Amino acid sequence: MKVLALRHSVAQVYADTQVYTHDDTKDSYENAFLISNLTTHNILYFNYSVKTLEILNKSGIAAIEIQSLEELFTLIRCNFTYDYENNVVYLHDYSYYTNNEIRTDQHWITKTNIEEYLLPGWKLTYVGYNGNDTRGHYNFSFTCQNAATDDDIIIEYIYSEALDFQNFMLKKIKERMTTSLPIARLSNRVFRDKLFPLLVKKHKRVINVGPRNESMFTFLNFPSIRQFSNGPYLVKNTIKLKQERWLGKRVSQFDIGQYKNMMNVITTIYHYYNLYQEKPIIYMVGSAPSYWIYDVRQYSEFLFETWDPLDTPYSSIHHKELFFEKDIGKLKDNSILYIDIRTDRGNVDWKEWRKIVELQTINNLDLAYKYLATGKSKVCCVKLTAMDLELPVSAKLLHHPTTEIRSEFYLLLDIWDVNNVKRFIPKGVLYSFINNVITDNVFIQSPFKIRTSMSDYIVALYALSNDFNNRADIINLINNQKQSLITVRINNTFKDEPKVGFKNIYDWTFLPTDFDTTNAIVTSYDGCLGMFGLSISLASKPTGNNHLFILNGTDKYYKLDQFANHTGISRRSHQIRFSESATSYSGYIFRDLSNNNFNLIGTNVENSVSGHVYNALIYYRYNYSFDLKRWIYLHSIEKVDIEGGKYYEHAPIELIYACRSAKEFALLQDDLTVLRYANEIENYINKVYSITYADDPNYFIGIKFDNIPYTYDVKVPHLTFGVLYISDNMIPDVVKIMKSMKQELFGMDVTTSYTYMLSDGIYVANVSGVLATYFKMYNLFYKNQITFGQSRMFIPHITLSFRNNKTVRIETTKLRIKSIYLRKIRGDTMFDMSE
């Protein structure tokens, strides 16, 4: 949802939009809660409170002050990520298609011949990093840029088997127009750019697990972050390959040679980071014009020094000349060298050309060895061709996509490789590597061993759920790692599937109850964003590939109403209640009936079951930004940090009742996942609360009334306001609590309206208006370790007779309380108080 705050109303009506006017009788938190549970996507918030907007944004719900109709129109028609700390809106808006335009934030693409293969009459526009160059399009009171681009389509094409780019792009655009917006992909880059600067500033050592190419620019600024990926393809791994011949396959219609060079250099940079944790000087020989240097320097500043007879316009220092062996002495330590020397073939006969290429390969390799032979802190990436070669067994083979698969590949070497054992690799084996292996990631660091690291902050976004990881190891890491941000795939199946398919692999699935943490926040993507100064206009879908975000060691853990809070907890319930249910009271009625409470008079105000817990369980797929386990735990240890809002503390038994209702709901819906989740939450409640039951009571609290509007034959008709199991020396403690609640007890609005048979031979009158006070008293007894209440639900009633009688219905009648007393069962009254 998105909340657009205005000082005055607008005449125009928008689809999927509700209006909310600030309620001055409620505080900012209560207004935020009410707004978050509205059911439309767009909320126009009039006479707004800035504090309410802050609360919504911290909850991950985008809420923005609007100063003009143009701002309103722009934000109401598309989704976006909002940096509420810096007042920057990142639109995810593809309406630029109506200009016959596709967009990119990679400059090198604009220097290719890609426009020859676009849809007829279409053009390519460069918009800068995250759409930074579009800021001039929006003259708004907040900074605004459109981060939507088509780079995902272009990059997917490069790695696909498709050759016809126009048809590929047409299909992908049509898919984009008919499926839901991939909001997480668009928003994730904004999130990463906010997340990692904060982590590096706060923590000495940061580990990042499973980065992919989407993050390759983000981490250029962070050489100290240790990356873990799937590992490199080593020379020694070629032993598994069978010999093949030259294939000669076209990969892309437009020239992507620059993409290949960029990926090679960035791979080399990250290998250098892994070894030395600092930025290198970047030396490049050949590969002009290297327009991609502009892209790298848009994200992070490097010193590029290049040699090539052709211009290299974005190099820091360019030598418009050839590079020779004698020039190696000019290269400094703490550097990387990229060797991409290859003479143009021209009209040379292919046999003669092959001899030239093989000689250049030997020379290139010799340059690499000489560069690495002296000095320190060096890494080299060198172009080679498929031929009989002796190569270090530990060297890394690279084959990033290029325009055509021919005979070239690249070798990544460091100082240790040069001194390692060399192995003879036949030409046919290298052709087999070239023909069958594509390097699909610039991060080639070793795989992460799933174990705790107490001195590190571990980040693992979308990286650990794969079923080739041991599920128990993942759980153990999350349970024991002191500081981390880890995601795992949420179990949003209906059959409680332990793993689900994703692309060509399987992911383990998880529920919050799979983890045993006491200092971690478990939330959704949008809930996590709120903790890092961001919010989003589109929440995660209830089905599909969604993840739990688990933050260990966060300083926001105790701020229960500010982060991963209960905003939106009833939104799904409201959607169903007013569109599909038999009555808008369906939820209340079901919760009471499923706990054998058949008095439904005033069911929407006389709550005996926690609606929060019930909704958090049965609709967890929609509202898992709310960290239910944390909410339960902090209440159980009485460390709830509440800043504001209408606060009601549930008695633990109310939470148990909610679990029982949720289990019955799950059985009726055949929802095995909710059934397990509700069972495990009930077990968790019993674990963190020391709940005892007076199922064999020896005392009770009774309430006598001045007026009983029914015929009765018992000696003293009374309301049993709870039973106790106590020792005699605890009586003073019970009396003290009763006295402390005297005003509230006598202030109850107690009513009755009918009689019924509670069971065979027990004729009773119903009682309404006492449950809220009962549960408050329950809490006081619980905190004083006094056993109060039974395991079955408390059903308030007045016993009238021990004979069977017909039901009588009367007008709702107020009962006047005469006295409240503590009495021993089959014994004496120990305490009695009147108003």
Swiss-Prot record:
Pfam families assigned: Rotavirus_VP3 (PF06929)
The entry's keywords: GTP-binding, Host-virus interaction, Hydrolase, Inhibition of host innate immune response by virus, Methyltransferase, mRNA capping, mRNA processing, Multifunctional enzyme, Nucleotide-binding, Nucleotidyltransferase, RNA-binding, S-adenosyl-L-methionine, Transferase, Viral immunoevasion, Virion
Compartment list: Virion
GO molecular function: GTP binding; hydrolase activity; mRNA 5'-cap (guanine-N7-)-methyltransferase activity; mRNA guanylyltransferase activity; RNA binding
Chain intervals for the UniProt region annotation (GTase/RTPase activity): 556-692
GO CC terms in record: viral nucleocapsid
CDD domains: capping_2-OMTase_Rotavirus (cd20757)
Predominant subcellular localization, coarse grouping: virion
EC number: 3.1.4.-, 2.7.7.50, 2.1.1.56
2'-5'-phosphodiesterase activity: annotated segments: 693-835
InterPro entries membership: VP3_Rotav
Region (N7-methyltransferase activity): 171-245, 429-555
Annotated spans, 2'-O-methyltransferase activity: 246-428
Enzymatic reactions: a 5'-end diphospho-ribonucleoside in mRNA + GTP + H(+) = a 5'-end (5'-triphosphoguanosine)-ribonucleoside in mRNA + diphosphate; a 5'-end (5'-triphosphoguanosine)-ribonucleoside in mRNA + S-adenosyl-L-methionine = a 5'-end (N(7)-methyl 5'-triphosphoguanosine)-ribonucleoside in mRNA + S-adenosyl-L-homocysteine; 5'-triphosphoadenylyl-(2'->5')-adenylyl-(2'->5')-adenosine + 2 H2O = 2 AMP + ATP + 2 H(+)
Record: active site: 718 (for 2'-5'-phosphodiesterase activity), 720 (for 2'-5'-phosphodiesterase activity), 797 (for 2'-5'-phosphodiesterase activity), 799 (for 2'-5'-phosphodiesterase activity)
Record GO biological process: symbiont-mediated suppression of host innate immune response; viral process
Top-level taxon of origin: Viruses
Free-text domain note: Contains a bipartite N7-methyltransferase domain, a 2'-O-methyltransferase domain and a GTase/RTPase domain. The C-terminus contains a phosphodiesterase domain that degrades the 5'-triphosphorylated, 2'-5' linked adenylate oligomers produced by the host cell in response to IFN stimulation.
Its biological purpose: Multifunctional enzyme involved in mRNA capping. Catalyzes the formation of the 5' cap structure on the viral plus-strand transcripts. Specifically binds to GTP and displays guanylyltransferase and methyltransferase activities. Has affinity for ssRNA but not for dsRNA. Capping activity is non-specific and caps RNAs that initiate with either a G or an A residue. Together with VP1 polymerase, forms a VP1-VP3 complex positioned near the channels situated at each of the five-fold vertices of the core.
UniProt similarity note: Belongs to the rotavirus VP3 family.
Description of how the protein assembles with itself and partners: Interacts with VP1. Interacts with VP2.
Protein name: Protein VP3
Naturally occurring in which organism (per UniProt): Rotavirus A (isolate RVA/Human/Belgium/B4106/2000/G3P11[14])
